[in-house]
């Protein structure tokens, strides 16, 4: 049997299993781990996923790009008009659908130095799904679940609301960064994508329109420097802070979460 035939056969079996498990009513929770594990393994083992940003590391880099200035974000210092979580380690996702787990992994690294769980271990706890499955990607509930299971203190848009104005958003960002807390955010980038806000620069004035955000991006392939950092317009992000088609209708607007480990002392991160 050809490899393509095997792939199609297993995919068909997977679809049947998903239909059966997904239509079992009250038994849904009992089968959720089976579905999550099945769909993840099908994608990873059968080649239905291109391997995410990690699979093309450096291939889109352009040395001395005339269009994008190279900034050594890792070695930037916070001060003046710039609020920054210094030495923030980035990470590139290994599938096309695990931006949420990959973003969360960087937050764990930020606080603990190393992440005790792998990207796919985090994805399993979060209930992360590939495209074509109910609730694809990782929603805010799933993102929060991982940290809550670890005993971390979690705040999110579902329980605490979201900034209603751009000015409130900037204050929200600054308040967290001053406490050494990165902000995981999901917006319409790539149709729906989790990144982590780790910096904000007012550019030295109160204009607001020229403010920039520095984000850790687990799919960093579009600025000619595959270092895991993006520098983006704060206003542009705020007005594009919604999900395109992945999340449920009531969870599409301005999704975010923060998480800090037990006993976290913000004074140590300032």
Residue ranges, per PLM feature:
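Noncatalytic regulatory segments and standalone regulatory/sensor domains
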Residues: 34-47, 51, 60-68, 130-131, ...
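Ser/Thr/Pro/Gly-rich low-complexity linker/stalk segments immediately outside membranes or between
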Residues: 24-38
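Active-site-adjacent substructure of cysteine-protease-like catalytic cores
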Residues: 162-216
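Hydrophobic alpha-helical membrane-insertion segments, chiefly the h-region
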Residues: 12-22
């Amino acid at each position: 049997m050809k490899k393509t035939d095997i792939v199609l056969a297993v995919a068909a079996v997977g679809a049947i299993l998903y239909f059966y498990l997904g239509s079992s009513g009250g038994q849904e929770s009992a089968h959720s781990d089976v579905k999550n594990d099945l769909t993840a393994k099908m994608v990873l083992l059968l080649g239905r996923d291109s391997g995410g940003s990690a699979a093309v590391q450096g291939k889109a880099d352009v040395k001395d790009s005339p269009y994008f200035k190279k900034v050594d974000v890792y070695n930037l210092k916070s001060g003046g008009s710039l609020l920054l979580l210094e030495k923030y380690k980035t990470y590139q996702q290994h599938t096309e659908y695990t931006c949420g787990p990959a973003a969360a992994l960087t937050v764990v690294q930020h606080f603990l130095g190393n992440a005790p769980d792998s990207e796919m271990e985090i994805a399993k706890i979060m209930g992360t799904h590939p495209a074509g499955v109910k609730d694809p990607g990782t929603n805010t509930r799933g993102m929060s679940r991982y940290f809550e299971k670890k005993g971390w203190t979690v705040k999110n848009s579902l329980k605490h609301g979201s900034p209603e104005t751009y000015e409130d958003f900037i204050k929200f960002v600054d308040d967290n960064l001053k406490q050494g807390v990165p902000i995981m955010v999901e917006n319409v980038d790539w149709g729906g994508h989790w990144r982590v806000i780790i910096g904000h620069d007012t550019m030295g004035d109160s204009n607001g329109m020229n403010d920039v955000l520095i984000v850790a991006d687990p799919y960093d392939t579009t600025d000619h420097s595959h270092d895991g950092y993006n520098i983006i317009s704060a206003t542009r992000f705020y007005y594009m802070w919604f999900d395109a088609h992945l999340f449920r209708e009531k969870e599409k607007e301005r999704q975010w979460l923060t998480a800090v480990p037990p006993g976290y002392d913000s004074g140590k991160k300032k």
